[in-house]
Amino acid sequence: MDEIATLRRRIDELDLALVTLLNERARCALAIGHEKELAGVPVYQPAREDDVLANVRRANRGPLDDAAITRLFERVIDEARRLERQAAARRPGDGAAAGTVESA
Protein backbone atom coordinates (compact mmCIF):
# COMPACT_ATOMS: atom_id res chain seq x y z
CA MET A 1 0.00 0.00 0.00
CA ASP A 2 2.89 2.39 0.62
CA GLU A 3 3.90 2.17 -3.03
CA ILE A 4 0.36 3.04 -4.16
CA ALA A 5 0.29 6.05 -1.83
CA THR A 6 3.68 7.17 -3.12
CA LEU A 7 2.58 6.84 -6.73
CA ARG A 8 -0.67 8.67 -6.04
CA ARG A 9 1.26 11.54 -4.45
CA ARG A 10 3.42 11.68 -7.57
CA ILE A 11 0.31 11.78 -9.77
CA ASP A 12 -1.04 14.63 -7.62
CA GLU A 13 2.23 16.53 -8.12
CA LEU A 14 2.13 15.92 -11.86
CA ASP A 15 -1.50 17.04 -12.03
CA LEU A 16 -0.58 20.33 -10.35
CA ALA A 17 2.29 20.80 -12.80
CA LEU A 18 -0.07 20.09 -15.71
CA VAL A 19 -2.54 22.71 -14.45
CA THR A 20 0.26 25.27 -14.24
CA LEU A 21 1.50 24.45 -17.75
CA LEU A 22 -1.99 24.41 -19.25
CA ASN A 23 -2.73 27.84 -17.80
CA GLU A 24 0.59 29.18 -19.04
CA ARG A 25 -0.24 27.83 -22.49
CA ALA A 26 -3.69 29.43 -22.30
CA ARG A 27 -2.14 32.81 -21.46
CA CYS A 28 0.08 32.50 -24.53
CA ALA A 29 -2.94 31.56 -26.66
CA LEU A 30 -4.80 34.62 -25.38
CA ALA A 31 -1.87 36.86 -26.31
CA ILE A 32 -1.74 35.27 -29.75
CA GLY A 33 -5.50 35.75 -30.08
CA HIS A 34 -5.10 39.46 -29.36
CA GLU A 35 -2.37 39.74 -31.99
CA LYS A 36 -4.55 37.85 -34.49
CA GLU A 37 -7.39 40.27 -33.83
CA LEU A 38 -5.13 43.28 -34.36
CA ALA A 39 -3.92 41.76 -37.63
CA GLY A 40 -7.44 40.80 -38.74
CA VAL A 41 -6.53 37.12 -38.78
CA PRO A 42 -9.20 34.50 -37.98
CA VAL A 43 -9.02 32.64 -34.67
CA TYR A 44 -9.08 29.27 -36.41
CA GLN A 45 -5.79 28.46 -38.13
CA PRO A 46 -6.04 24.86 -39.39
CA ALA A 47 -2.45 24.69 -40.66
CA ARG A 48 -1.11 25.77 -37.26
CA GLU A 49 -3.33 23.23 -35.51
CA ASP A 50 -1.98 20.51 -37.81
CA ASP A 51 1.58 21.61 -36.97
CA VAL A 52 0.92 21.51 -33.22
CA LEU A 53 -0.60 18.03 -33.44
CA ALA A 54 2.26 16.76 -35.60
CA ASN A 55 4.80 18.21 -33.13
CA VAL A 56 3.25 16.54 -30.09
CA ARG A 57 2.92 13.22 -31.89
CA ARG A 58 6.61 13.39 -32.84
CA ALA A 59 7.52 14.09 -29.21
CA ASN A 60 5.37 11.23 -27.91
CA ARG A 61 7.34 8.32 -26.49
CA GLY A 62 4.41 6.54 -24.81
CA PRO A 63 2.87 4.84 -23.03
CA LEU A 64 0.03 6.95 -24.47
CA ASP A 65 -0.40 6.20 -28.14
CA ASP A 66 -0.48 8.92 -30.80
CA ALA A 67 -4.27 8.81 -31.05
CA ALA A 68 -4.59 9.53 -27.32
CA ILE A 69 -2.08 12.37 -27.50
CA THR A 70 -3.94 13.80 -30.48
CA ARG A 71 -7.29 13.67 -28.65
CA LEU A 72 -5.83 15.36 -25.58
CA PHE A 73 -4.22 18.16 -27.56
CA GLU A 74 -7.29 18.65 -29.74
CA ARG A 75 -9.17 19.36 -26.53
CA VAL A 76 -6.45 21.73 -25.30
CA ILE A 77 -6.54 23.56 -28.65
CA ASP A 78 -10.36 23.73 -28.58
CA GLU A 79 -10.25 25.35 -25.15
CA ALA A 80 -7.59 27.84 -26.27
CA ARG A 81 -9.73 28.77 -29.28
CA ARG A 82 -12.75 29.23 -26.99
CA LEU A 83 -10.73 31.53 -24.73
CA GLU A 84 -9.53 33.54 -27.73
CA ARG A 85 -13.12 34.05 -28.91
CA GLN A 86 -14.34 35.03 -25.45
CA ALA A 87 -11.54 37.54 -25.02
CA ALA A 88 -12.15 39.04 -28.46
CA ALA A 89 -15.86 39.39 -27.72
CA ARG A 90 -15.07 41.34 -24.53
CA ARG A 91 -12.68 43.77 -26.23
CA PRO A 92 -14.01 46.93 -27.83
CA GLY A 93 -14.04 46.95 -31.61
CA ASP A 94 -15.81 45.05 -34.31
CA GLY A 95 -14.49 41.61 -33.28
CA ALA A 96 -14.14 40.68 -36.94
CA ALA A 97 -11.45 38.09 -36.31
CA ALA A 98 -13.47 36.44 -33.56
CA GLY A 99 -16.57 36.28 -35.68
CA THR A 100 -14.93 34.82 -38.73
CA VAL A 101 -16.65 31.69 -39.94
CA GLU A 102 -14.42 28.69 -39.46
CA SER A 103 -13.78 26.02 -42.02
CA ALA A 104 -12.06 22.71 -41.46
Predicted region positions:
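Domain-level signature for soluble enzymes in the chorismate/prephenate branch of the shikimate pathway
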Residues: 1-104
